[in-house]
Each structure stands twice: as structure tokens, then as C-alpha cells.
């Protein structure tokens, strides 16, 4: 394995207690980045969740854990990997408390699963989930391809880890099997592969896990040896008669003393370390497995040696452990600004420097963890401080009395079954969707704090209008496919589809009435008006072969695509419980511009888009997208272009050959490069808007930034 980012540590500066003889110890050249990541995580937790008490994580003097166990972590990843590892240790401490363990585990698992499958999470404003969203956003920003598999691996770890803290294990074998999972087999795989940018082939992962079992167990034994005294004290403080530690298990299983159990543990750890050295030499010589699998297996040598060195000097397990001067300085004055966000710790809190102050004594020991001095409140305090402001004069808004269930019409016969009316809508709703708008609503609620019941109504209104607009768009554009399936009108016919789509406006209005105020109705009618005006211009240009200017095109987008974004943003502002009032118009307009232009671009270059909607569908529909406007302006006298476009209008569609001809002209004219460059500018506009909103609200929105990273092209 090649070493770029670490140096060999002088054996005279550490002690392994004979637990890993023959092992080299390496340390990362940029360990201060781990300092920043770990302390940033602690500050996030204190600000978003609550006090950490006497928590001591992965930092130490002279060595941090991560810089020892993954010495070849890519430098640009060390800070966020340190953040994630620190959160895992906090998670471990919380799940040790039986009262909260399962609920905490379930919440973490649900959030990681949601991020891995949809790229978002509900309730992103909640403390713990804000931290997870920050991790995901940063990892996706750095390496999107490896971030998602890593998050999936973490979900598996959380699902298993910490769920048997009260189990009285009856044998060493039973305990070992549990700990192989709990020590973080899946978590460590995800962390290490992301940190070192490894791509272990899927068919080799189980092999790697099996080969590394020896290393897993050795690390578990060393951990239990080093943490035994701490865990004894914790168990006594919590009134537990069970200690989840190999020493306790050996004492009970074999009826031996504490010292005898420790000695047996030491001897087994020594043997396993020697065995793993031989395993690595064997696999390094194999050429029938991938290079990254071999690197993964070899990297565990440093996990073993680093874990051994750190475990016996760290403040987490040793009362004599201390922190470095650099760490103490950061604890006192706060971590540097997050380069990705411009905030001190990623969470603006209204203080002068955004830091959490921790008192330390002269020898480098933390002496006080009281964080109230910086004005930060726990979740409970925040909730009690928020006053729910309700709109006055609600009686001025009443659409009608819907309390009575309609059983019949004018007393003659039963009411007609609405299933036929709803069938087209239910069809399109059932098609696969990324749920971007629902994700955006959850993200914006980090700022607005709309009560859950009203937030669900706003989501419902948004979903109804969005799907209804898709049904009408497909009819008006003559689309064949929607999300890879036949468009709704190709299943139910034009009349049924149009009727069902129009009815959804009634349903949306019924949902709106549940909000119970006049301002919401005003927002609803204004933005619905804008949406239809925008769509009318799009249809007019297509039908009459009128090529708009780029300015006119973006005006149309702000009405049509931006209208729905503005609708839910304005509704959330109306029902916000946050006393800070901020106008989202610039943000939603910029988001609409970027989203539509991205869609225009994907229509031309994305294989997935072709699968979902067809090859260059915009050409077939005759749409004047941003790329088409650029092409028309660049080649105004090109007769091939003009005739192909006219023939599309005459025939009502375009052949594959005609579409390929237009695409070739776009490549010749530099249209694709122009569109890609435009996306970069539009994305910067959205990022600037997000930063301005974060400044006005005083809270960084990790969930919104994660969505933006996932939408980023190129």
C-alpha cells in the first residue's frame, strides 16, 4: 500500500502492552483537521440537542483515534470523517442509557435509511437529524458516488448496534458474535472506504468482512480491556447489574476473577493480532481479488495498532489522559469557519463567534461542561420559548359547510362513486417519484417551524397540484411516457385525464380550507394564477413557432416552475412559528430557474431521463427550452434547423433521426457547453440565496444544502 498522507510513529513514543507485536504505527500528517471535525460535532450536538455532560470522544494527546486507525485518510475527508466518527461515539454513549437507547437507535436508523434511499430526511430540523444531514451533505459534496453506499452501511450498523446493552450473555462466543456487529462492522466499512476512496466490488465485500473478522475481534478485546474501569463505573451509576464487556462475560461464564479474565483477554488479543499479520501477508500476494479489496484488508493493520495505542492514552478511558494545546485552544475559542458554509461550526446561533466554551485547567483536562453561557438552549428550552402565533379574524374566510357527509343528491339515489374520477390521479401518484418538493418543504421547515398538522396539509396541497399539473402537461405536450411508464392520458384517455386533473384543484382547495385563514387563500390563488400564465406562454410559443428571448423564457419559468415552489414557501411563511419573517421569493425564483434548466439539460444528455421520458423528448414536443433558444439564436439562418423544426410542427412529432440532427447541431453550436455553464451560474445564484436566508434566519440549513448537492450537475 502506498503511503502519502501519514508518517511512521517512533515506537519509543507509545505503548502497545504487547497486544500487537510486529505492527507499525502511522499517524496522519494533518491530524489537526480531525480536531476540527470532532469538536465541530460536539458543538453541533450541544447547540442542536443539548449538553454532553462529561463526554470525552476520540481526541487525545499526543494521538487522536482516527488519525491513527485510518492514517491514509484523504485530507479533504478527514474533518467530516472525524465528525461522523465522533457522532458514532456520542451515539454509543446515548444508547448505553437503556431508557433512551432504542428510541435513539430507531431515529438514527430511520434518518440514515431515508438519506440513502431518497437523499433527504423528514424532521431535519430536529437536533440529531440536523447533525446527520450535515454529515450527508458534506460527504455528498466531496464524493457523491461513495457517500450513498457509506450511508447505507451506517443504517445497517445502527439497526444492530446497541440493542443488547442489557443482555446477560452466557458465553464468550455469543458475546463475540454480537460485538462483531456492535463494534461497527458496517459502520467501519463505510467510514474506511469513504475516507480512503476505496471501491470494494460488491461481490467481494462479504469476503472482506469474513477475512477481517480476526481484526474485528482483536479490536473488540482491546476496547473492552481499556474501557473496563469506565464501564464498571457507568454500570454502577445507572444501577445496572450487567456490564456489556468481555471481562464481565468471562468472569460469569468461567467463574474466574477480574484479573484472570483480563489476562485471558490479553492473551487472546495477542494471538489474534499475530494471526492477522499472517492473513494480510497471504492476501497481499493474491492477484485474484481487486486492488481495493487488498487495500481494505491491509488497512486494518493500522486499525489494530492505532486502536491499541489510542485506547490506553485517551481521555475517554483514562483519567490521566489529556488534550493537546491545539485542541484546548479550539475548545476555548471555537473551531474555525466551515469552508463549505462560511459559519464557525456549521450552525449559526446568534452569538458573536458561534462557539461553545468549555473550561479547561492548566494540565489539559476538561473541568466544566456547562454550556449555558453562550446562550444556546436545548431542544426542550427552544420548544418552551416558541410562542404559537395564530392569525386573527379567521371568520372572514369560509368557503362553506363541509361538516355534513353527502349521502344523496336532492334526496334521490345514492351519491356517485368518486373512484372513477380519482383513478387517473391515483395512477400518476403511484408512479415512482423522488419527492423533491416534499423534501424541500421538510428542509424549509428547519427555518419556519410550521406545526406538524399544518405542514402535512401544505405537503398535501403541493403534491395534489404538482401531480395534476403533470397530468395536464402530458396531455398538452403529447407526452408518451411519465417516469418510465405510459403517460396518464395514454391509459385513461384525454377526457378522463383532463377531468380528473381539473378536479384536483377542488381537492387542493378543500385541503387549503383546513388551514383556516384568508392569507393562505390569497397565496393559493395568486400562485395558481402565475402557474397557468406561465404554462400558457410555453404552449403559445410551441404552437406558433415563436422563439422567445432568454429573458422571456426565464420569466415563464418563474411563473410556471417557480410558482409551485413559491406556493409552498409562502404558505409555510404564513403558518411559521418562527418570529423571524423572511421573504423567500428570490430563493424560489432562483430554484425554479435552476431546476427547469437542469431538466432541459438532462433531457438531452441523461440516459436515465431517456429511459423515463424518451430520447430528447423536448424536441418531439417542440418546446423552446433554454438549449433550443440558444441554438436558434446561434444559428438563425440554418435552413436544416428551421426545416426540421417546421416539419415537427406540421407532423405533430419528430422522428429519431430528426431529433438526432438537432442534437448534432447543438453540439456543433456549443449549446450543451453553454447550458452546462448556465447551470453553474444558476446553481451559484441558488447557493447565494440559501446563504442569505441562513444569515437572516440565523440557522444553517444542512438538509437544504444536501438537496442542492444531490441536484448538482457535473
Swiss-Prot record:
Biased composition of type Low complexity is found at 341-356
Q: Where is this motif: DDXXD motif 2?
A: 473-477
So where does Mg(2+) 1 get bound? 92, 96
Q: Where does Mg(2+) 2 bind?
A: 92, 96
Q: Where is this motif: NSE motif?
A: 276-284
Could you tell me which residues belong to the region Disordered?
Answer: 332-356
What residues bind isopentenyl diphosphate, as annotated?
434, 437, 466, 483
Region spans: Geranylgeranyl diphosphate synthase: 326-713
UniProt-annotated binding residues for Mg(2+) 3: 473, 477
Positions annotated to bind dimethylallyl diphosphate: 482, 560-561, 596, 603, 613, 623
**Where does this chain carry the motif DDXXD motif 1?**
92-96
Annotated GO MF terms: lyase activity; metal ion binding; prenyltransferase activity
Q: Which UniProt keywords apply?
A: Isoprene biosynthesis, Lyase, Magnesium, Metal-binding, Multifunctional enzyme, Repeat, Transferase
Which GO terms fall under biological process for this protein?
A: alcohol biosynthetic process; mycotoxin biosynthetic process; terpenoid biosynthetic process
InterPro entries assigned to the protein according to its UniProt record, in alphabetical order = Isoprenoid_synthase_dom_sf, Polyprenyl_synt, Polyprenyl_synt_CS
Q: Which pathway features in its UniProt record? A: Secondary metabolite biosynthesis; terpenoid biosynthesis
Region annotation (stellata-2,6,19-trien synthase) ranges: 1-325
Q: Which residues bind Mg(2+) 4?
A: 473, 477
Q: What does this protein do?
A: Multifunctional diterpene synthase; part of the gene cluster that mediates the biosynthesis of the sesterterpene stellatic acid. The first step in the pathway is performed by the stellatatriene synthase that possesses both prenyl transferase and terpene cyclase activity, converting isopentenyl diphosphate and dimethylallyl diphosphate into geranylgeranyl diphosphate (GGDP) and then converting GGDP into stellata-2,6,19-triene. The cytochrome P450 monooxygenase Stl-P450 then catalyzes three successive oxidation reactions on the C-20 methyl group to generate the carboxylic acid of stellatic acid.
Subunit architecture: Hexamer.
Q: Which family does it belong to?
A: In the N-terminal section; belongs to the terpene synthase family.
- Its protein name is Stellatatriene synthase
Q: Which organism is it from?
A: Emericella variicolor
Amino acid at each position: 500500500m502506498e503511503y502519502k498522507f501519514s508518517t511512521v510513529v517512533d515506537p519509543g513514543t507509545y505503548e502497545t502492552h504487547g497486544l500487537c507485536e510486529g505492527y507499525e504505527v502511522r499517524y496522519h500528517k494533518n491530524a489537526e483537521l480531525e480536531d476540527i471535525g470532532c469538536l465541530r460535532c460536539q458543538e453541533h450536538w450541544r447547540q442542536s440537542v443539548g449538553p454532553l455532560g462529561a463526554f470525552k470522544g476520540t481526541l487525545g494527546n499526543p494521538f487522536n483515534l482516527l488519525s491513527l486507525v485510518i492514517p491514509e485518510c484523504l485530507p479533504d475527508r478527514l474533518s467530516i470523517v472525524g465528525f461522523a466518527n465522533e457522532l458514532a461515539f456520542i451515539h454509543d454513549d446515548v444508547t448505553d442509557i437503556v431508557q433512551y437507547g432504542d428510541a435513539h437507535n430507531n431515529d438514527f436508523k430511520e434518518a440514515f435509511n431515508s438519506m440513502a434511499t431518497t437523499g433527504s430526511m423528514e424532521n431535519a430540523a430536529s437536533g440529531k437529524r440536523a447533525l446527520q444531514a450535515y454529515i450527508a451533505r458534506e460527504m455528498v459534496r466531496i464524493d457523491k458516488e461513495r457517500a450513498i453506499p457509506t450511508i447505507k452501511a451506517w443504517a445497517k450498523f445502527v439497526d444492530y448496534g446497541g440493542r443488547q446493552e442489557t443482555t446477560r450473555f452466557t458465553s464468550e462466543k455469543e458475546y463475540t458474535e454480537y460485538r462483531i456487529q456492535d463494534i461497527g462492522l458496517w459502520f467501519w466499512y463505510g467510514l474506511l472506504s469513504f475516507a480512503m476512496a476505496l471501491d470494494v466490488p460488491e461481490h467481494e465485500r462479504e469476503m472482506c468482512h469474513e477475512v477481517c473478522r480476526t481484526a474485528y475481534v482483536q479490536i473488540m478485546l482491546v476496547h473492552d480491556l481499556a474501557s473496563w474501569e469506565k464501564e464498571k463505573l457507568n454500570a454502577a451509576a445507572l444501577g445496572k447489574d450487567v456490564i456489556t464487556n468481555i471481562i464481565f462475560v468471562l468472569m460469569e461464564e468461567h467463574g474466574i476473577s477480574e484479573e484472570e479474565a483480563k489476562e485471558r483477554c490479553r492473551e487472546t488479543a495477542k494471538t489474534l493480532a499475530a494471526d492477522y499479520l499472517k492473513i494480510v501477508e497471504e492476501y497481499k500476494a493474491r492477484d485474484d481479488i481487486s486492488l481495493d479489496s487488498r487495500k481494505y484488508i491491509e488497512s486494518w493493520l493500522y486499525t489494530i495498532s492505532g486502536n491499541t495505542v489510542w485506547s490506553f492514552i485517551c481521555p475517554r478511558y483514562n483519567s490521566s489522559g489529556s488534550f493537546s494545546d491545539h485542541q484546548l485552544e479550539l475548545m476555548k475559542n471555537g473551531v474555525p469557519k466551515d469552508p463549505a458554509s462560511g459559519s464557525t461550526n456549521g450552525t449559526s446561533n446568534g452569538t458573536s463567534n458561534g462557539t461553545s466554551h468549555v473550561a479547561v485547567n492548566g494540565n489539559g483536562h476538561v473541568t466544566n461542561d456547562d454550556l449555558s453561557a453562550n446562550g444556546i438552549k436545548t431542544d426542550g428550552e427552544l420548544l418552551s420559548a416558541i410562542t404559537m402565533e395564530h392569525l386573527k379574524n379567521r371568520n372572514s374566510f369560509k368557503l362553506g359547510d363541509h361538516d355534513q357527509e353527502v349521502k344523496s343528491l336532492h334526496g334521490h339515489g345514492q351519491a356517485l362513486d368518486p373512484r372513477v374520477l380519482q383513478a387517473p390521479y391515483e395512477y400518476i401518484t403511484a408512479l415512482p417519484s423522488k419527492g423533491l418538493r416534499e423534501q424541500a418543504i421538510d428542509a424549509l421547515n428547519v427555518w419556519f417551524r410550521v406545526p406538524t398538522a399544518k405542514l402535512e396539509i401544505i405537503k398535501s396541497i403541493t403534491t395534489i397540484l404538482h401531480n395534476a399539473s403533470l397530468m395536464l402537461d402530458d396531455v398538452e405536450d403529447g407526452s408518451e411516457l411519465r417516469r418510465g411508464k405510459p403517460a396518464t392520458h395514454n391509459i385513461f384517455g384525454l377526457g378522463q385525464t383532463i377531468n380528473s386533473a381539473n378536479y384536483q384543484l377542488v381537492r387542493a382547495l378543500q385541503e387549503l380550507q383546513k388551514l383556516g385563514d384568508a392569507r393562505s387563500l390569497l397565496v393559493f390563488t395568486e400562485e395558481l394564477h402565475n402557474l397557468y400564465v406561465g404554462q400558457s406562454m410555453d404552449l403559445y410559443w410551441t404552437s406558433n413557432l415563436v422563439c422567445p428571448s432568454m429573458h422571456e423564457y426565464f420569466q415563464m419559468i418563474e411563473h410556471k416552475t417557480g410558482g409551485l415552489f413559491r406556493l409552498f414557501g409562502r404558505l409555510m411563511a404564513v403558518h411559521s412559528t418562527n418570529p423571524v419573517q423572511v421573504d423567500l421569493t428570490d430563493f424560489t425564483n432562483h430554484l425554479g430557474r435552476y431546476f427547469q434548466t437542469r431538466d432541459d439539460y438532462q433531457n438531452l444528455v441523461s440516459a436515465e431521463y431517456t429511459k423515463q421520458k424518451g430520447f430528447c423528448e423536448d424536441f418531439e414536443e417542440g418546446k423552446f427550452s433554454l438549449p433550443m433558444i440558444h441554438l436558434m439564436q446561434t444559428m438563425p439562418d440554418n435552413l436544416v434547423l428551421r426545416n426540421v423544426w417546421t416539419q415537427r410542427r406540421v407532423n405533430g412529432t419528430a422522428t429519431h433521426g430528426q431529433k438526432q440532427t438537432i442534437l448534432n447541431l447543438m453540439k456543433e453550436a456549443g449549446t450543451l457547453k453553454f447550458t452546462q455553464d448556465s447551470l453553474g451560474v444558476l446553481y451559484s445564484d441558488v447557493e447565494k440565496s440559501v446563504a442569505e436566508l441562513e444569515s437572516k434566519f440565523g440557522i444553517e440549513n444542512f438538509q437544504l444544502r444536501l438537496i442542492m448537492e444531490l441536484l448538482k450537475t457535473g
